[in-house]
Amino acid sequence: ERTEIMEQKILAYLKEHETEIFEDLKSLVLTEASTSDIEALAKVREKLVMLIKERTGEDCFVYEAENGHCPVRFQYGKGTEKILFIGHYDTVHLIGALKYYTEGNELHGPGVYDMKGGLISAIWTVKAYKDLGIDPGKRLEFIFNGDEETGSAESTDIICELAKDAKAALVCEPCTANGDLKTGRKGLVRFTVRIHGKASHAGNAHKEGI
């Protein structure tokens, strides 16, 4: 019952601040940054750090990265258990490829869905907790990288290290169009197979093998 009441309070709070949330999303989306544009990434990262500070009051730690895809980390709450929230601030499309516009209550533009909408959701989750005086009872740690769209080569080790002591990890990708929450995702595994024997054609000369 207590959890249900808290959920209702949080939802009511977010509904009340919907216009501000959309403005924050618009601000972040209009600060475009494809993975390959390091200068643009720096600008959107600066905007992201500013939003986190203004909305949550929390300071960010910005990692150094050789190629400029610097991850941003901040945390909120206390507790023995940690929940890790993962997101990214880079986008696929080159600057200017997609235009920002609204259609009814829908927002369109580069990164609205993938995944600046998720970043804003994470930030406003913390703001709701703080403004409503609700203790999450856990440490909430957030890590947003800038090279996800090309495979997270520079940030994988950082994310894996932060995940080691996490009770759970949640990726801040928005839900599907009907509101369903994604609870699983396909992965990628690479194998190197070394075979010792006698080469032969499996279809035409398999008897020549071993």
Give short role names for the model-derived ranges.
Residues 106-121, 201:
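Glycine/serine-rich anion-binding loops at beta->alpha junctions
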Residues 202-210:
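Acidic-enriched catalytic cores of C-N bond-cleaving enzymes acting on peptides and small amides
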